[in-house]
């Protein structure tokens, strides 16, 4: 089946009632105003019986009641530096949060941010950690949608030179990254006695390079004592060339969202003409068909005259000086941000650059920045995009891979991910054989009822959205999930959708949901 408009492949929801508000289909009409008596609450982690506290781990223990600015007990966690030797010559910083979920006793989940050179503490503090301090908020708050409610999670700054991990970097390509990471991971497993645990690797953005290469190296070890890999998830990932991920989809995406961009008709005519002339639209029309075409089209070259993404972004700044390509619906003023990312307005300080924060995390005085100015790859990343290399093999060997993408990301585009998938061959076939249009449903929860009646939920961020939030399509061990209202960081913008998605990966089945998307209480 051919779909001539690239965006159209995800606009089709495939239901007879598509004109009905999809967010209300599963909601019965209210009868009377009633209070919600029973409510789920965020996990309160106040036990002194720390499961992972041993003589080996005591030096990493973080006092969960003394984290600066955090006025609640974060519970058991461990942070510090472990060596990445023998393949590396430095150490990597980690912050490990055990879960109170009894179903998580035999697994460990790894979270990696991208960059290259961006700290995974960004993911912890503003996306899926047990406490959040997101842009525009006054102070840290508990995160009812923390992934630690589902599983044990470790956030790692890697490669060396990223975040709290001391440099200089000595990696030249993704094979070096994987070798140094897996050397570090063996030290981590030995320290916390995690031998034989099921391992899941997750991340976003440039982690679309990191995760498949690390996963491939783990599987190649054939050593389930340390590398019992069971699945991966990569969101808004860098998995192909810039031509496919950024430039070919840029103008089609602008057209779809120009009610937000509000660029004038003269510019639209000019930039659409350039996209046609450069071959971007023709490439998408051929690439995003189901099943994929044979032969598959070659992505256009990015010449000096074909840098359409750059021109769109420059024009967007003229209309909206606070345009944020990580989340294209941001407007002025910038939200102040303790990290300065992904909101572009810096706050009064850099939280992780504070000496009291660094002391409690057991790191030496460090000039921390969320995305390091240190060069990670001195001569550029020498590896091919992961979709050309290890990603298809990882899909085949785990049969449990999720690629997620937010529609409101204007840096790496969902149609870039789709075009990439259609050019990959795994488990005997190339690409998806049918369009990825099945709706992703996230269950409703009590907090939304409080909002309906005008009550103030407690805590407010409990009220992540519910209903039909995107699409989720699975073929031959690969799931592609799109999220309508998310930018580059899905756990930050639409936590319920990402929690549902990751919950499915943990049981090696793509079923929505498994452990739930409402706040969990295992106490």
Curated annotation (Swiss-Prot):
Q: PROSITE patterns recorded for this chain?
A: CARBOXYPEPT_SER_HIS (PS00560), CARBOXYPEPT_SER_SER (PS00131)
Q: Which GO terms describe its biological process?
A: proteolysis
GO molecular function annotations of the record: serine-type carboxypeptidase activity
Pro-piece positions: 19-52
Cysteine disulfide links: none
User: Signal sequence span per UniProt?
Assistant: 1-18
* The keyword Cell division belongs to this UniProt entry's keyword annotation: no
Gene3D superfamilies this protein is in?
A: alpha/beta hydrolase
A Pfam family that this protein carries is: Peptidase_S10
Q: Which domain of life is it from?
A: Eukaryota
Which positions does UniProt annotate with glycan attachment? 55, 63, 89, 149, 264, 353, 399, 415, 423
Outcome recorded upon mutating residue 205 to A: Impairs catalytic activity
Functional summary from the UniProt entry: Removes acidic, neutral and basic amino acids as well as proline from the C-terminal position at pH 2-5.
Which family does the UniProt entry place this protein in? Belongs to the peptidase S10 family.
Q: What is this protein called?
A: Carboxypeptidase cpdS
Taxonomy of origin reads:
Eukaryota, Fungi, Dikarya, Ascomycota, Pezizomycotina
Its encoding gene is what? cpdS
